[in-house]
């Protein structure tokens, strides 16, 4: 899609499109909660027929929510890291976002379910590895779980 909403597709009911998706580069860096302007853009995309939005740019995980019938994952964090040599621990939390889309007759293109698989990027020996949050231990596990509850709720 172009930057100018006036140039966006007008026909949200186009039956040749099963699911319109957007991957916007948006929001402020290193903020866990989307800015009101970002939320407004999500509503605008939803109003233009986008059914799934997976945002990026904040470098940290952000909430997942429904905007009408549109599923919005505001930010998934960093999969491979940033240019920062010593990134603070909250910026090392990321998520793999899996969305199930129906192919059934009559429901084709609708979101049947989703799940976020949170992970922590841990460094060791000059390399980083992705560790599922449930595999963490000690105080770091408690900190990460508390942060995720603050972002996503229980």
Describe the predicted segments one by one.
Residues 1-154:
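Acidic, metal/ion-coordinating pockets
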């Amino acid at each position: 899609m172009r930057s100018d909403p006036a140039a966006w597709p007008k026909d949200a009911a186009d039956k040749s499109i099963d699911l319109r998706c957007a991957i916007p580069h948006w929001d402020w860096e290193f903020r866990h909660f989307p800015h009101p302007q970002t939320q407004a853009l999500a509503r605008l995309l939803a109003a233009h027929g986008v059914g799934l939005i997976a945002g990026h740019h904040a470098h940290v995980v952000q909430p997942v929510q429904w905007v009408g019938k549109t599923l919005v994952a505001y930010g998934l964090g960093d999969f491979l890291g940033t240019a920062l040599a010593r990134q603070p621990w909250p910026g090392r939390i990321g998520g793999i976002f899996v969305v199930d889309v129906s192919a059934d007759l009559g429901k084709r293109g609708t979101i049947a379910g989703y799940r976020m698989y949170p992970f922590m990027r841990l460094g060791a020996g000059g390399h980083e590895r992705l560790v599922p949050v449930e595999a963490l231990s000690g105080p770091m596990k408690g900190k990460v779980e508390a942060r995720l509850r603050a972002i996503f709720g229980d």
